[in-house]
């Protein structure tokens, strides 16, 4: 908790993903944070954090946004795409799943977080950021075991293809 307090106090822009895995299930909870500019979770992580299996993802994401006083909360939903809540825009932005071929989904949430944090931190709109981050995740699911990074030129080409 001491490290979290230091990060909260010193970070110019703070993006947080409290990833759930076999080594930390339930112990690295978003509720340990009192602020974040961006919280990025997948749907199971969201449901675990709120202890709620039944309410809508949007309702639970807003609950987390308020708990952590976050500017943005993004929820990746696998085959259901992604959503992002924006406090300042008072909107929910949605992106459909942008990949047609999934080889390995490990790392897709990390790719989403990386591009979402970078985009929002640079001042892009949450709508545009959700799309770009979803495109990065779509590329990532086509890479086995994060073998290769997502090259900027590959992301540009993929986005161009999606927009045609």
Predicted features by range, described:
Residues 2-92:
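Conserved phosphate/ATP/ADP-binding segment of small-molecule kinases
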Residues 71, 98-162:
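Conserved post-catalytic alpha-helical subdomain immediately downstream of the catalytic base
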Residues 77, 162-163:
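C-terminal catalytic "cap/lid" subdomain
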Residues 89-101:
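Glycine/charged-rich beta-loop-alpha catalytic/anionic-binding loops adjacent to active sites
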């Amino acid at each position: 908790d001491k490290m979290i307090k230091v990060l909260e106090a010193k970070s110019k822009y703070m993006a947080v993903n409290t990833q759930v895995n076999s080594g930390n299930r339930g112990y690295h909870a978003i509720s340990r944070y009192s602020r974040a500019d961006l919280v990025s979770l997948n749907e199971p992580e969201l449901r675990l954090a709120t202890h709620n299996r039944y309410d809508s993802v949007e309702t639970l994401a807003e609950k987390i946004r308020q708990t952590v006083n976050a500017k943005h909360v993004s929820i990746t939903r696998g085959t259901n795409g992604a959503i992002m809540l924006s406090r300042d825009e008072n909107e929910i932005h949605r992106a459909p799943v942008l990949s047609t071929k999934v080889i390995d989904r490990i790392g897709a949430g990390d790719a989403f977080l990386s591009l979402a944090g970078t985009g929002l931190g640079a001042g892009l709109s949450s709508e545009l950021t959700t799309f770009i981050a979803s495109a990065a995740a779509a590329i990532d699911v086509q890479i086995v075991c994060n073998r290769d990074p997502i090259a900027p030129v590959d992301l540009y080409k993929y986005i161009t293809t999606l927009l045609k």
